[in-house]
Amino acid sequence: MKYFTLALTLLFLLLINPCKDMNFAWAESSEKVERASPQQAKYCYEQCNVNKVPFDQCYQMCSPLERS
């Protein structure tokens, strides 16, 4: 019973106070990711939509990044 209560408490805390990085679990460290193809960029924007990420953050993450 203790473990069940603990698990429910942890789940509740995760639901009400999600970690910022968890929203971008499908990306690398909440930073811009180099997108090699339009399909990858489309997938990135779709994931932003699913995770309800604001457009400006999504644009920063999904737009291609020139690496120097």
From Swiss-Prot:
Signal peptide positions on this chain: 1-21
Claim: Cell inner membrane is one of the keywords in the record: no
Keywords in alphabetical order: Disulfide bond, Host cytoplasm, Ion channel impairing toxin, Pharmaceutical, Secreted, Signal, Toxin
Recorded consequence of changing K42A: Decrease in ability penetrate membranes
Disulfide pairings: C44-C62, C48-C58
Tissue occurrence: Expressed by the venom gland.
UniProt GO MF annotations: ion channel regulator activity; toxin activity
Cellular component per GO, a single term: extracellular region
Domain remark in the UniProt entry: Has the structural arrangement of two alpha-helices stabilized by disulfide bonds (CSalpha/alpha 2(S-S)).
Extra remark: Negative results: has no effect on Kv1.2/KCNA2, Kv2.1/KCNB1, Kv3.1/KCNC1, Kv4.3/KCND3, TRPM8, and TRPV1.
Subunit structure of this chain's protein: Monomer.
Family per similarity comment: Belongs to the short scorpion toxin superfamily. Potassium channel inhibitor kappa-KTx family. Kappa-KTx 1 subfamily.
Protein name listed in UniProt: Wasabi receptor toxin
